[in-house]
Amino acid sequence: MVVTKLATQRPKLPSVGRLGLVDPPAGERLAQLGWDRHEDQAHVDLLWSLSRAPDADAALRALIRLSENPDTGWDELNAALLRERSLRGRLFSVLGSSLALGDHLVAHPQSWKLLRGKVTLPSHDQLQRSFVECVEESEGMPGSLVHRLRTQYRDYVLMLAALDLAATVEDEPVLPFTVVAARLADAADAALAAALRVAEASVCGEHPPPRLAVIAMGKCGARELNYVSDVDVIFVAERSDPRNARVASEMMRVASAAFFEVDAALRPEGRNGELVRTLESHIAYYQRWAKTWEFQALLKARPVVGDAELGERYLTALMPMVWRACEREDFVVEVQAMRRRVEQLVPADVRGRELKLGSGGLRDVEFAVQLLQLVHARSDESLRVASTVDALAALGEGGYIGREDAANMTASYEFLRLLEHRLQLQRLKRTHLLPDPEDEEAVRWLARAAHIRPDGRNDAAGVLREELKKQNVRVSKLHTKLFYQPLLESIGPTGLEIAHGMTLEAAGRRLAALGYEGPQTALKHMSALVNQSGRRGRVQSVLLPRLLDWMSYAPDPDGGLLAYRRLSEALATESWYLATLRDKPAVAKRLMHVLGTSAYVPDLLMRAPRVIQQYEDGPAGPKLLETEPAAVARALIASASRYPDPERAIAGARTLRRRELARIGSADLLGLLEVSEVCRALTSVWVAVLQAALDVMIRASLPDDDRAPAAIAVIGMGRLGGAELGYGSDADVMFVCEPATGVDDARAVKWSTSIAERVRALLGTPSVDPPLELDANLRPEGRNGPLVRTLGSYAAYYEQWAQPWEIQALLRAHAVAGDAELGQRFLRMVDKTRYPPDGVSADSVREIRRIKARIESERLPRGADPNTHTKLGRGGLADIEWTVQLLQLQHAHQVPALHNTSTLQSLDVIAAADLVPAADVELLRQAWLTATRARNALVLVRGKPTDQLPGPGRQLNAVAVAAGWRNDDGGEFLDNYLRVTRRAKAVVRKVFGS
C-alpha cells in the first residue's frame, strides 16, 4: 500500500532553481557539500542564506574550493555555518560579492574564523600597533615580510567587508558608509606606519632615522577611503638629509608591494619636484608658486605617521594659506579651468557609466563642496573639516546651502560611494565604472551587493537603474542649487528665513569665486529678477540657479547676467519666454552661452526674440539651421514690396534682417556654422536689403507715365562682391545705369543718381540695428567722381584712365542687385580690363607692390599692433587678399578659373594650377579663415566693428570662444593666431618678391 505524505511532511529543502543558482553544476556542488541530503531546519536556513548572497553561484564555487582545502577544517566550518546565522551572513555575503576575497580565503583558509562570533574591529591605535608588531616579529625574515603584511591587511579588509556586507544576507546591523570609509583609512594609516618602520630599518639600520612626517591627502587624509584606492601622500622633513628621499622611496615601495599604490604626485611641482622637502621649502613653495588646485588638495591634508609634531607644524603653517586662497588673483580663472577639466576627463562612450567623473557623479559633489569651503571657510571655522559628508553638514548648518539640500546631497553621495565600494570589492581593483546597462547579470549582482531589493514593480536590477537615474539627476540639480539657491534666498523678499552664514558679503565672495567680476552688481541683477511681483519672480527663482550655473561657464558671466536681465525685462509680457526656458533646458543653456559671450546678439534678440525658440533641436537637427538664407532673402524682398512708402518698406526689411542676423550670430556662437557659411549668409541678407531698398525707391520715384528713365544695377565690390562679408564689413558698391529708350544720358544719370542717393540715405538712417552703410568710394575717380555712370561711361573710363588699384578692385566686382541683365553686361565689359588677354603689365604689378608697401606703413591705425590687427596686420586679411589678387592679375588670362571673386575659391584654383605650392596655399587659407573668424568674433563680442585683437584678459577669452576655439584660453588662441599669420606672411613675402 502506497502512503502519501502530508504536505507538511514533504521535503523542506528548496530546489536549485528556487535558490537562484544558475550554474549547471550547482546541484552537484550542493551534493558535494552534503547540503542536499538533510531536511532539517538548519540546512533549510543555510540554503536560503546562500540564495541571498549577491552572487550565490560565486559563493557556492568558493565554498567548494574551501571544502577541498585540507587546511580549512571543513567539518568545523560546516558545523559553524549550520549553527551561526551571523557567520553565514558574513561569509556568504563576502563570497558572493568579492571574487578577490574568496581567493584570499582559499589561500588562507583559517581566516574564516575571523568572521565568527562577536567580531570587533580594532581601534586606530590597536591596528597600528598590530601592523608594527608584525614588522618587528618578521625581523630576520625579510623574504616573508611583504607577504605577512599583505595577509594581515587583507584579513582586516575581509573582516570589515564581512561586517559591511552581512546585512545583504542576514538580519545583521548595517555599517554606515562613513564608518566603513573611516575604518579603511585607519587600515591605511597602520599600513603606512608599518611601511615606514620597514623603510627606516632598511635605510638607517641602527642609526636614528631622519625626522619625517607623512601627510595623507585625498580620501585617506579625509578618512573617507575606498576599499581600493591610491593613497596620496606628501613627505615633510625636519631638515635636509640625503636619507630623507631614500626612506620615503623605500616606504612607498614596501607599501605598494604589500597594501596599495602610494602616490606622491600631489607634492610641490608634482612628479618633477623633490620627493621630500623641508617644512620651510613647503612654505616657500605655497607662498610663491602653488596653484588653486594645490590649495584645494590641502583641504584633505592629515598627518598620519612619522613625526607627529612636525606634521602638526606643517598644517599650522599651510592651512591659513588654504583659507586665503580665494583672495588670490588667479583664483577664479583656475577654478573655472578645474571645473572644465573635470567635465572633459570622461570619454564620451562611458560617460553615462562613470560614477566618479560623469555628470551627476561623485566629483560633482566633491568639487562643489570643496569650492564652497575655499570661499567661505576663511571667515567660518566650522567649515574647516576634511570629509565631504562632514563638510556638507557644516555647510547646511551654517546656512551656506539649504539643510534639506545638504541632507539630500549627502544621501546621494553616500549611495554613489556605496556602489563604488561594491564595484571595487568584486576584484579588489580600482574602478568607478558601472556595468553596461545591457549586462543584466552584472547589474543584478551590483543591486544585490548594494542591498537593493525588488519593489513590486521592478526586480533588483530595475530598481537600481531607476535609483541611479534619480540620484544622478538629483546630484546635477543640487550641484547647481548648492552654488546659487542660497544666493537667491539672501536677496529674496524681506522675511525669508536665511541662516546666519549667507550674508551679502559671503554671497559676493561666492559669486566672485564662480567667475563674476562684479559680484555686488550681479546680486542686484539677481535681486531685480527674483523680486518681481507675481508669477514671474517665482519662475525666475526656480530658473536662476541653473541659468547662473550655465552662465558661469561663459567668458563674461557679468555681461551675460546683465543681458539676461534686460532681455527678461524686455520680454516681461511674453508668456512663452520663461516657459521655454523652464521646459526646454537645451534652449536655456544655449541662450546663457550666447548672452555670456556676445554683446552683438543679445541686442538683436531683444528686438527679434522669437529666434530664441529656434535654439532647440528639431527632428533634422538644430532649428537655427532650418532657415535657408536664400529663402530669407526672398521673404525680405517680398515683405518690402508690400509697402508703397519707402520708410515703412525699409522698416519691414530691417525687421527681417534683424531676425536673420540674430539667427546667424546665434548659430555662429553655438558652433553650428563654418565661417564661410557665416560670410555667405551675411552677404545674402545684405544683398536682399539692398535689392528691396532699390526696388521700393524706384517704385516711389517713377514719373507719371510709370516708365523708369533708366535701368539700374548695383555692382558689389570688395567682400560684398566676393560673398565674404563679415559682421563688421563695409558694403562696397558701384551704381551703373542705362537710359531707357528715348531718354538721354544726362536725364538717365540724374534720375539714377537721385535713386542711388536716396537708397544710401534710407539705408544709412541711424538705427539701433547694426548699420547699413553703402560705400561707393571704389567708383571711378573715387569720392570726386559721379555716383552713377552709364555703362558706356564706365567703359570709356576703364579703357583710358584705369589705375592699377582700380583694376585690382574690379577683381571682386559682381552684380548683386538691380537689373540683372545690365549687371552682367557690366561684368563682361570690365572683364577686358581686369582679365586682359596678355595679362597685366609689369608696371602695373610694380605699382600694386608699391601701393601695398605704402598701405602697410601708413594705413595701420595709430597705436595698433601689426601682429594682431586682423585686417591690415601681418598675415591678416589684406595680406592674403592682395596676394590672391596679384596672382589673379598675373595668371587669370591663362587660368580662366581665376575669373572668380571669392578669395577661398581662388585659393583652390591657385593650388590646382600649381601657381604656388599647395602647402603654401594651405597656409594662406588657414590665415584667411583664422583672421576672418577672429574679426567676426570681435564684432560678436564687442557689439561694434573692430579689427584689433585685445590683449590678454576676459575679452580675449570671449573672442576665442566666439571664434570657435576649443576652450576659453585666450592665450592659446592668440598664440595660434600669431603662429598661423606669421607663416602666411612668409608666403606673402615670397609671392610679392620682398
UniProtKB/Swiss-Prot annotation:
Renumbered residue ranges of the record's region Adenylyl removase: 1-487
Keyword ATP-binding on entry: yes
GO CC entries: cytosol
EC number(s) reported in the record: 2.7.7.89, 2.7.7.42
Example GO BP: regulation of glutamine family amino acid metabolic process
Lineage: superkingdom: Bacteria
Family: Belongs to the GlnE family.
Function summary: Involved in the regulation of glutamine synthetase GlnA, a key enzyme in the process to assimilate ammonia. When cellular nitrogen levels are high, the C-terminal adenylyl transferase (AT) inactivates GlnA by covalent transfer of an adenylyl group from ATP to specific tyrosine residue of GlnA, thus reducing its activity. Conversely, when nitrogen levels are low, the N-terminal adenylyl removase (AR) activates GlnA by removing the adenylyl group by phosphorolysis, increasing its activity.
Protein name: Bifunctional glutamine synthetase adenylyltransferase/adenylyl-removing enzyme
Species name: Mycobacterium tuberculosis (strain CDC 1551 / Oshkosh)
